């Protein structure tokens, strides 16, 4: 995990005496590319492969130069299904992180996700970043819907099984 602030990369902030909000040493707004060579082991063959990026701004993911997809959600982790693009062997994984304001509605800029009073408009990736190999069937998503007046919770699951049909009762 890293940010431009931690690396000291970007435009030098000469107004470090500011006391009304956060005062960063450097600022950066725009696209940044992060590349890593990954070696997918034979043990991943036949499994679903997901890339997880826990905390970031807008991302676009590429495998061996081919665009896989984008996510601009700043509230939840980004998850990409790379199953069709990764197979055993070496691959180049590229993640574009772009904190440019053009990707977000104007109303977001005074929210905690961007203001210099709370966390700033940082660029980078924080938290866990990992590839996950999952066997079928697997839980794709979980949603909990609380109903306090009934003292109950409804659980909504999406279970995927892409290789063989199975019947289950929950």
Where are the model-predicted features located?
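Accessory carbohydrate-binding/adhesion or oligomerization-edge regions at the termini
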Residues: 1-15, 92, 96, 100-103
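Hydrophobic alpha-helical segments, principally membrane-spanning helices and signal/leader peptides
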Residues: 14-15, 20, 113
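Extracellular/oxidizing-compartment recognition motifs
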Residues: 18-21, 28-31, 80, 144, ...
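Low-complexity, intrinsically disordered short segments enriched for Gly/Pro and polybasic residues
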Residues: 21-24, 170
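Accessory beta-strand-rich segments of carbohydrate-active enzymes
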Residues: 24-138, 162-163
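Beta-strand-rich binding/interaction modules
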Residues: 61-63, 152-170
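Short, solvent-exposed loop/linker segments at the N-terminal edge
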Residues: 145-151
């Amino acid at each position: 995990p890293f940010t431009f602030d931690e690396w000291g990369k970007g435009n030098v902030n000469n107004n470090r005496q500011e006391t009304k909000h956060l005062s960063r040493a450097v600022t950066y707004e725009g696209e940044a590319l992060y590349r890593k060579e990954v070696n997918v082991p034979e043990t991943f063959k036949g499994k679903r492969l997901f890339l997880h990026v826990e905390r970031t701004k807008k991302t676009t993911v590429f495998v061996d130069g081919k665009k896989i997809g984008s996510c601009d959600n700043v509230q939840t982790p980004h998850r990409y299904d790379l199953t069709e693009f990764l197979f055993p062997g070496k691959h180049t994984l590229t993640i574009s992180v772009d904190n440019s304001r053009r990707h977000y509605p104007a109303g977001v800029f005074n929210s905690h996700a961007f203001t210099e009073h709370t966390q700033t408009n940082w660029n980078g990736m924080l938290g866990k970043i990992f590839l996950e190999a999952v066997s079928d069937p697997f839980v794709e998503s979980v949603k909990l819907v609380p109903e306090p007046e009934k003292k109950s919770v409804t659980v909504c699951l999406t279970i995927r099984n892409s290789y063989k049909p199975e019947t289950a009762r929950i």
